[in-house]
Amino acid sequence: MYSNNMYIITGASDNHYLTLMNMIDSFIKYNDRHKLIIYNLGLEETKWNNIKEKYSKQDFIFKIFDYSKYPEWFNINIEAGQYAWKPTIIYNTFLEYTDEILVWMDAGNLINENLQKLETFLINNYIYSATSNGTIKDWTHPLTIQYLNCKNIENENRNGACMGFNTKIGFVKDFITEFYNCAKDKNCIAPEGSSRKNHRQDQAVFTILFYKYLYEQNKTCYSNDHGKYNLCHSIHNDIESHWDK
């Protein structure tokens, strides 16, 4: 059972230029029918033009993230914009490509096989994200936990490097909308006193919502071993220096 195609979304600023091209090349190597949306998150004009020229024969969708529409703290050059641009891009893509399967992939990811396993998982389970180190309590600021009224703080973290959404499903639409609404509110995604030392911004919010919506729907894919691993990809293959270092 297959969807017509999935929309894979990625992007980068200047410090992930080479890393982004590495990810794009891996997509080309293993892709047979899915779409790739590439966001300019702060690439200088020469680099952006180089990417568009290099992949001009591919059927890619090129977009520039318009920071002017959002609060100043979205600026990717200041504390990585608190990663608020990521759920915002997912939401905007959802509005443009309604009822499709959407997958965010960080530029540091590498696709290492065709995406059939990931697609099948999303058709059957609706939301995908592998596990990450620690728990909600370990990597979520208490004010975000309070804001989202999270009670299950011992749950495993999910990984924000790859997040998949089957937007044909009603509660997934609600999930994406709440994810975006939280990203717009700094008190939710990056409250006072939070930093990368004690909080994981978009990943922290995604994790809380992941369990909230799956519990409400009585879905148990979070306990499915298949859903704990990086399906069809690896993460943290950055060539340039990473923001967290």
For the regions a language model picked out, list residue spans one by one.
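Glycosyltransferase catalytic domains, chiefly GT-A lineage
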Residues: 1-245
